């Protein structure tokens, strides 16, 4: 018995390789007697595909599984929508790194066939939600699977802010900003900023300062249930931006307050059977193999 009956397809736009893999995947799914629905934006690059179309939010409501063909950015974008319906997501890598999209396009029929036959592993990944308040009123909100980043925007200047964890004062800082990362995001921008790699099963949030004007500032790891609050200094000349996964952003003003916490909804991420997180790290990050290999 197949665990999935209705499959949604989302593809990376502007990538001929992704389109090629999408067409190949559609042909394969057509042999499996499954209902297939194509994301309406993806459908613009799949002329005459012959399948029903729907928005991403509707895909989450209608589908048992959504397959994303693209890079990690494509999956991050889909995750922020599909987490609302807890729809399982499976990634086929047609990007660069592919930390989250772990099926090779060369193995698409074999590996996806195994998943459709019920041979897969699933895990829950939490997201972060950021809110910006001005004079006590919410002026913006956004969420991210990888991270929430506070940065000065286009201006190359430092910003001043105060950091609080669960209402307790941590420090005041002048820096280029702060990366607040999930375990999923610990191998993304936070890694470039000198943050630790955090196993995705850990319920933890990492805070990584960006070029702090101090010799003693280091990344901090806190419980994922923590509430992170940032008070933007009123004397800042820059208008700090709050960026989620590098894809959505809210512009703040000096004096604003930002609150970041774990989002209630989680992403259900599907992997082929035998998925190994540390093997992924070795492959994607260029870690050394065992001696003699």
Curated annotation (Swiss-Prot):
Q: Name one GO biological process term.
A: NADP biosynthetic process
Q: Which EC class does it fall in?
A: transferase
Q: What is its main location?
A: cytoplasm
Q: What catalytic reaction does the record list?
A: NAD(+) + ATP = ADP + NADP(+) + H(+)
Q: What residues form the catalytic site here?
A: 72 (proton acceptor)
Q: Which UniProt keywords apply?
A: ATP-binding, Cytoplasm, Kinase, NAD, NADP, Nucleotide-binding, Transferase
Q: Which cofactor does it need?
A: a divalent metal cation
Recorded GO MF terms: ATP binding; metal ion binding; NAD binding; NAD+ kinase activity
Q: Which Pfam family, just one, is annotated for this protein?
A: NAD_kinase_C
GO cellular component, as recorded: cytoplasm
Indicate the family of this protein.
Belongs to the NAD kinase family.
The record's function comment reads:
Involved in the regulation of the intracellular balance of NAD and NADP, and is a key enzyme in the biosynthesis of NADP. Catalyzes specifically the phosphorylation on 2'-hydroxyl of the adenosine moiety of NAD to yield NADP.
Q: Under which name does UniProt file this protein?
A: NAD kinase
Which organism does this sequence originate in?
Chromohalobacter salexigens (strain ATCC BAA-138 / DSM 3043 / CIP 106854 / NCIMB 13768 / 1H11)
Q: Gene symbol?
A: nadK
């Amino acid at each position: 018995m197949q665990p999935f009956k209705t499959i949604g397809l989302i593809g990376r736009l502007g990538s001929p390789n992704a389109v090629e893999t999408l067409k190949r995947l559609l042909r394969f799914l057509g042999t499996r007697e499954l209902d297939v629905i194509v994301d309406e934006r993806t459908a613009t690059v799949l002329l005459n595909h012959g399948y029903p179309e729907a928005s991403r939010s509707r895909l989450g409501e209608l589908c048992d599984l959504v397959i994303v063909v693209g890079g990690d950015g494509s999956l991050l974008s889909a995750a922020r929508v599909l987490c609302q319906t807890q729809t399982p997501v499976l990634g086929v890598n047609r990007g660069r790194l592919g930390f989250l999209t772990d099926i090779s396009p060369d193995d698409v029929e074999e590996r996806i066939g195994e998943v459709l036959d019920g041979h897969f592993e699933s895990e829950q990944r939490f997201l972060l939600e950021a809110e910006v308040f001005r004079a006590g009123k919410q002026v913006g909100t956004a969420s991210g699977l990888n991270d929430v980043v506070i940065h000065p925007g286009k201006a190359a200047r430092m910003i001043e802010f105060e950091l609080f964890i669960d209402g307790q004062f941590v420090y005041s800082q002048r820096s280029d900003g702060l990366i607040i990362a999930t375990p999923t995001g610990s191998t993304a921008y936070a890694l470039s900023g000198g943050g630790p790699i955090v196993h995705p099963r850990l319920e933890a949030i990492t805070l990584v300062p960006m070029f702090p004007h101090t010799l003693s500032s280091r990344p901090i790891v806190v419980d994922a249930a923590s509430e992170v609050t940032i008070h933007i200094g009123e004397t800042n000349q820059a208008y700090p931006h709050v960026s989620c996964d590098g894809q959505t952003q809210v512009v703040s003003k000096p004096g604003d307050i930002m609150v970041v916490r774990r989002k209630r909804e989680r992403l259900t991420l599907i992997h082929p059977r035998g998925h190994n997180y540390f093997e992924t790290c070795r492959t994607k990050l260029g870690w050394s193999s065992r001696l003699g290999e």
